[in-house]
């Protein structure tokens, strides 16, 4: 008799906890096998991720290997390319193999979560730091150390202020916690750099609501958090959205431009694109599940976590996309999958939210418990730490985090970069009208192609007034002359219409110049064309 296969898509809280719950229930059974597919081989404990920025905990303390959590589960570290519901098949993108891998399932669990989606806001994908996983946290930390270092040595006052201005978009849990840790980190570290004063630092939080945590916490706790962060130097801009981002600005909905080299966006998120391509009922981009976690209209497909729309067991709306709900949903899902296999009745999900917590940095936090009790300050911070410490998966992780917290008190912060913020070989940039793309005399480290938009080319006359000497349109190259001649720009470029450019590092293209045919082709791209 062949084994029944349960395939779980996603290794977040919902996915890995479903696998763990199934393993516990299948200890004495050998007729069922569990397969989990994830793009990472670890679970990120996201509630503590902001502490990676400040260095309060070690780099790897927020992650736990999936195989340690679910040792009896077959794990594929692959990208899912397709799900064929009719043939009960999951297709995995190739890795070292040249062909796709196809896996048959008897039961499918969809726990893919959501993804950061910057597509609706021009420039955000190119110039904002998302904050969803460990890589994002490490990249942001490296960047913060780099801009502080550059600010301490630059002689350009405008650039210095730009480097020391930090903008965070979003006033929900993620945005507030990131803002609090970032503010603590940069102000504390600024005092350690020669020629930097912490008072020069600006940290600005932009939020669409009229106060932070306006949907997440009672008004009294939200106001407490707001006043506390203001006291620490954080500035707030309310009832405003970030409209677009460029290499030098965060542009707000009212047209205001904030000069900055650091924009962190905790919003927006959207359904995982794969979910939209699975042949199951959807609403608001999420899979419609019942209280049993069974997808409507199916008997062997289950959905839970952020990607699922599950009715609230108390009859008010839907279950929130939080870790505490995902963990309990996983328990119900595992129970009901085995109930279907064993021909037993299903169990409905029942859970009452225990509470909500937010860390505000510097040993302060806010807590809403059992929808009745409000706590704030140092006591709330102690409870916040203990609650999440207990929830950390794995005893070894608890030990490591405890040691990190203790050594942080004794030794302070480590300003060490991990190399996660290295410039990419190919980048995309967005510019707004009137913005300078290139300044005359500026050394250009990149060769760029104007993908869309329009720019004008300026040259400074002997009397120091600029003269327009030409225009660039979609398809034209920027910096090709300087690349071929190994010189700095003898002209400036200013954006006329909203433009997007694709840029390539000169050092990556340099080896191509040794090929005569390639160099001849590049010569034809010089500006002006008759040169």
Task: Write out the residue ranges for each language-model feature.
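FAD-site-proximal beta/loop scaffold in flavoenzymes
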Residues: 127-156, 249, 257-326
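A Rossmann-like FAD-binding core segment of flavoenzymes
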Residues: 33, 75-90, 183-291, 295-297, ...
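Cyclic-nucleotide recognition modules
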Residues: 362, 469-528
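Beta1-alpha1 glycine-rich phosphate/pyrophosphate-binding loop at the start
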Residues: 1-82, 166, 176-216
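FAD-binding core/adjacent interface of flavoenzyme oxidoreductases
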Residues: 2-3, 74-165
């Amino acid at each position: 008799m062949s084994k029944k296969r349960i395939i779980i898509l996603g290794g977040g809280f919902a996915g890995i906890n479903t696998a763990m719950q199934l393993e516990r229930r299948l200890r004495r059974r050998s007729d069922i096998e569990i397969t989990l597919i994830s793009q990472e081989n670890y679970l990120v404990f996201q509630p503590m991720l902001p502490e990676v920025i400040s260095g309060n905990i070690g780099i790897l303390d927020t992650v736990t290997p999936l195989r340690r959590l679910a040792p009896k589960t077959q794990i594929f570290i692959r990208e899912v390319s397709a799900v064929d519901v009719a043939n009960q098949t999951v297709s995995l993108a190739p890795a070292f193999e040249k062909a796709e891998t196809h896996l048959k399932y008897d039961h499918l669990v969809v726990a893919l979560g959501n993804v950061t989606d910057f597509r609706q806001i021009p420039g955000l994908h190119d110039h904002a730091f998302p904050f969803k996983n460990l890589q994002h946290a490490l990249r942001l930390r490296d960047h913060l150390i780099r801009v502080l270092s550059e600010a301490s040595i630059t002689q350009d006052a405008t650039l210095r202020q730009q480097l020391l201005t930090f903008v965070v978009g979003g006033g929900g849990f993620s945005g507030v916690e990131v803002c609090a840790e970032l503010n603590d980190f940069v102000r504390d570290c600024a005092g350690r750099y020669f020629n930097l004063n912490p008072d020069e630092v600006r940290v600005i939080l932009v939020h669409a609501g009229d106060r932070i945590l306006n949907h997440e916490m009672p008004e009294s706790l939200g106001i407490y958090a707001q006043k506390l962060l203001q006291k620490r130097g954080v500035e707030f801009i309310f009832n405003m959205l970030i409209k677009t981002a460029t290499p030098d600005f965060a542009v707000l909905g009212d047209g205001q431009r904030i000069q900055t080299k650091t924009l962190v966006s905790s919003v927006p998120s959207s359904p995982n694109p794969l979910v939209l391509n699975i042949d199951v009922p959807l609403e608001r981009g999420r899979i419609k599940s019942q209280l049993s976690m069974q997808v409507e209209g199916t008997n062997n497909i289950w959905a839970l976590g952020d990607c699922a729309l599950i009715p609230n067991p108390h009859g008010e709306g839907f279950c929130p996309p939080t870790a505490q709900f995902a963990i309990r949903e996983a328990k119900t899902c595992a129970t009901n999958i085995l109930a279907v296999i064993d021909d037993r009745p299903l169990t409905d999900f029942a859970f009452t939210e225990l509470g909500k917590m937010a860390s505000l940095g510097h040993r302060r936090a806010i807590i809403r418990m059992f929808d009745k009790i409000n706590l704030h300050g140092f006591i709330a911070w102690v409870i916040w730490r203990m609650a999440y410490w207990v929830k950390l998966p794995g005893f070894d992780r608890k030990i490591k985090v405890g040691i990190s917290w203790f050594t942080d008190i004794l030794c302070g912060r480590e300003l060490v970069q991990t190399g996660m913020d290295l410039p990419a070989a190919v980048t995309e940039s967005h510019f707004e009208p009137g913005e300078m793309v290139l300044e005359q005399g500026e050394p250009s480290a990149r060769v760029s192609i104007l993908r869309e938009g329009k720019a004008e080319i300026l040259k400074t006359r002997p009397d120091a007034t600029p003269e327009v000497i030409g225009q660039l349109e979609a398809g034209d190259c920027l910096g090709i002359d300087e690349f071929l001649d190994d010189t700095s720009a003898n002209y400036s470029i200013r954006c006329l219409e909203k433009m997007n450019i694709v840029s390539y590092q000169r050092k990556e293209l340099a080896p191509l110049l040794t090929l005569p045919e390639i160099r001849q082709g590049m010569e034809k791209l010089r500006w002006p064309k008759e040169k």
